[in-house]
Regions:
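A noncatalytic interaction/capping subdomain that flanks phosphate/NTP-handling catalytic cores
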Residues: 1-100, 110-121, 127-240
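Conserved lysine of the Walker
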Residues: 104
Length: 240
């Protein structure tokens, strides 16, 4: 079946029904026109993933492999996978990044709790495109275990790296600091051409997007600090 994902036509060659149901909202109305990406899974890829995922169904394992295939081809179209939670506010997207367990979903949910007009684009594995001198964040079916996201897109206007801390503080990061953290949040393809394209994409992100380090607790004060730094606006809680 053909799906519309991140502005591209993607043919997904799946064996199990899991992915068909998983991607239903992204099914293309046009199943006949040409495609940009053909995603498939070899027996070797499936077996390798299954060896690492013994407690999951074959359909789930195939689904993981298929998205890896899709994302490995994205650099051909000036796009990459970013491991982040991305939300939209006032027509602009903001990405929250960090190691597993640092609270990306928790912090972005606090944005939704305390700020009017916030919505999730993707809670875990969005696709980014660089187009017309700006970055576009796309929702995808792969949204993480919480299932937070929509089939939508918005210009990405800032990055916020999270660290747990006993007190809340935020600072603007240097290019070197951003590079060290950002590199761990992407999928680096195996093909040399795609590796080069991905690294060029990351260079643009580092140079063109403001990046912040938020050391935070689970609190409204943490939301205020990240909101004001990323948006440049005064924080007003919707609960007042």
């Amino acid at each position: 079946m053909v799906y519309d994902i991140a502005g591209l036509r993607v043919f997904i060659d799946n064996k199990y029904p899991y992915t068909t149901k998983f991607c239903t909202k992204y099914l293309s109305e046009d199943q006949d026109a040409g495609v940009d990406i053909h995603a498939t899974v070899t027996e070797e890829e499936f077996a390798e993933e299954k060896a690492c995922s013994l407690n999951f169904s074959d359909g789930y394992i195939e689904n993981i492999c298929l998205y890896r295939s899709i994302c490995a081809q994205m650099p051909l179209f000036n796009r990459i996978l970013l491991h982040a939670a991305i939300i939209e506010y006032d027509g602009k997207a903001y990405a929250f990044l960090g190691r597993s367990g640092t609270g990306k979903s928790t912090h972005t949910r606090l944005w939704m709790k305390h700020i009017d007009g916030v919505k999730f684009i993707n809670g875990d594995k969005p696709i980014l495109e660089y187009k017309d001198n700006q970055f576009i964040a796309y929702g995808t079916p792969w949204m993480g275990k919480e299932g937070l996201g929509e089939k939508t897109q918005a210009p990405l206007c800032g990055l916020c790296f999270l660290e747990q801390a006993p007190e809340n503080s935020i600072k603007r990061m240097t290019a070197a600091e951003t590079s060290a953290r950002l590199f761990t949040q992407i999928l680096l393809p195996k093909e040399e051409e795609n590796v080069v394209s991905t690294l060029d994409f990351l260079d643009k992100m580092i140079l063109e997007l403001p990046s912040y380090l938020l050391k935070c607790t689970i609190s409204e004060e943490a939301v205020q600090k990240s909101f004001e730094a990323l948006t440049g606006k005064q924080y007003i809680s919707k609960n007042i």
